[in-house]
């Protein structure tokens, strides 16, 4: 049994002003100047040194949106002069997949290394597109929960990347008749992928590589690793064999875009000796035919199972994975591990403005980012994700992430629930 894996996080405040979600509008015209003003009781000290800060006009708007949204001052003001508003700049962040809340949550995790807590309860919605159409089944009754996040019980998140033997051929003396294929062991089922829309600066790339090294995982853009990736092409198998002949310890992975032909191609590559398949969707999690990554990976996993060689190959999935829960849900759909890209940039304070694509200056100056700062922010993010993965697995009663692969019984798919449970009662959904 491998040793317990622990990510060493430490607070790493942002270099630039974070775009806050909430702000308080103060209608001072009718203020009674109470000596015990509710502003003084702010749990987050947002109003400290208010007078000094308001004298400078440069950061006035930033100051307005430092509110954490607890509503304590709004509800307690005796004159009802305080009103909470949503920052329009916050609402403009990202898009329908990389939502402002996801971006803000990623910033928080990269800063603190802690699990984000959104409130005392969740009122919905309980279903949405993509990953939100999957509910993880916390099966406490089926199996007792495990408490791995606090260290009292052991939960393993280690995975092995590489080809596995479906059987062990033995010599008469009991020794292996052929050598065991090379593998790359990583303590957390998360790889670091290349950016989807542009090549980052040398400093950002170096920080990603060193963060991967500190975490014990692999950056797919790092040539120093024994895990090498090739894009799919007609002669990719030839290239893989040439590389493996020069380095027998090399684990070869082929990057295969998800689409209508990906299942047949993945089966073909596996039969020709490829060690791992990197099934990639676009950065919104969609295959070339519009299928979401969860459905595409599930179909690919099932094809391997029906062929009887699922354990012979490692399946890495990437595209649209923006939260820790998406890691668990992708593994449930059949992937061995995932690769992430955009969350790494968000950890470095990226705002998804895409100015870099148009040659416009980055608002956070990412090209000149401090190395140690960037490494620690990425480590903090993975530390928070790792803790959430342990929480989910513990609630499911699963003690290692390898057992979670393809375990669809630990999840509820909304389409199945609608067809089998709600459909017969309420009929076909109209919207």
Q: Where would I find each of the regions flagged by the language model?
A:
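Conserved, well-structured core domains of diverse proteins
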Residues: 1-38, 43-190, 194-210, 217-218, ...
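Generic recognition of stable, solvent-exposed alpha-helical segments in well-folded globular domains
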Residues: 37, 72, 203, 207, ...
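Structural motif
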Residues: 194-196, 222-224, 239-242, 255-258
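Generic structural signal for well-ordered alpha-helices
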Residues: 209, 240, 244, 266-267, ...
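Glycine-rich phosphate/ribose-binding loops and adjacent secondary-structure elements
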Residues: 19-23, 28, 33-35, 39-44, ...
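Active-site or pore-adjacent capping/gating segments
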Residues: 346-412
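Acidic (Asp/Glu)-rich catalytic clusters
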Residues: 226-236, 243-249, 269-273
């Amino acid at each position: 049994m491998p040793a317990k894996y622990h990510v060493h996080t430490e607070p790493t405040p942002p270099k630039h002003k974070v775009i806050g979600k909430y702000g308080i509008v103060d209608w001072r015209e009718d203020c009674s100047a109470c000596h015990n003003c509710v502003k003084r009781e702010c749990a987050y000290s947002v109003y400290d040194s208010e007078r000094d800060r308001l004298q400078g006009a440069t950061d006035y708007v930033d100051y307005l949106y430092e509110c954490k949204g607890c509503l304590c001052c709004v509800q307690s003001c005796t004159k009802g002069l305080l009103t909470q508003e949503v920052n329009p700049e916050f609402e403009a962040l990202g898009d329908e997949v990389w939502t402002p809340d996801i971006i803000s949550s990623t910033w928080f995790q990269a800063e603190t290394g802690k699990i984000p807590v959104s409130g005392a309860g969740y009122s919905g919605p309980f279903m949405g597109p993509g990953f939100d159409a999957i509910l993880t089944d916390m099966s406490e009754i089926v199996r007792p929960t495990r408490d791995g996040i606090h260290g009292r019980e052991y939960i393993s998140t280690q995975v092995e990347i590489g080809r596995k033997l479906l059987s062990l051929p033995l010599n008469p003396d009991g020794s292996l008749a052929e050598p065991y294929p090379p593998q790359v062991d990583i303590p957390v089922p998360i790889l670091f992928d290349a950016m989807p829309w542009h090549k980052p600066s040398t400093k950002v790339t170096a920080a990603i590589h060193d963060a991967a090294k500190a975490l014990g995982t692999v950056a797919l853009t790092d040539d120093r690793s024994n895990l090498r990736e090739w894009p799919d092409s007609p002669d990719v198998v030839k290239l893989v064999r040439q590389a493996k002949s020069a380095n027998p310890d090399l684990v070869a992975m082929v990057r295969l875009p998800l689409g209508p032909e990906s299942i047949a191609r993945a089966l073909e590559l596996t039969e020709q000796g490829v060690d791992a398949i990197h099934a990639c969707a676009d950065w919104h999690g969609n295959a070339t035919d519009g299928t979401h990554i969860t459905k595409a990976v599930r179909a690919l996993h099932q094809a391997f199972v029906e062929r009887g060689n699922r354990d012979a190959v490692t399946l890495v999935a990437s595209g649209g994975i923006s939260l820790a829960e998406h890691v668990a849900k992708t593994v449930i759909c059949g992937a061995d591990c995932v690769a992430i890209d955009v969350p790494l940039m968000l950890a470095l304070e990226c705002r998804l403005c895409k100015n870099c694509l148009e040659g416009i200056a980055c608002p956070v100056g990412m090209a000149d980012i401090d190395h140690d700062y960037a490494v620690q922010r990425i480590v903090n993010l993975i530390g928070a994700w790792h803790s959430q993965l342990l929480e989910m697995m513990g609630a499911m009663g699963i003690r290692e992430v390898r057992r979670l692969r393809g375990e669809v019984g630990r999840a509820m798919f909304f389409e199945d629930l609608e067809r089998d449970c709600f459909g017969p009662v309420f009929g076909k959904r109209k919207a």
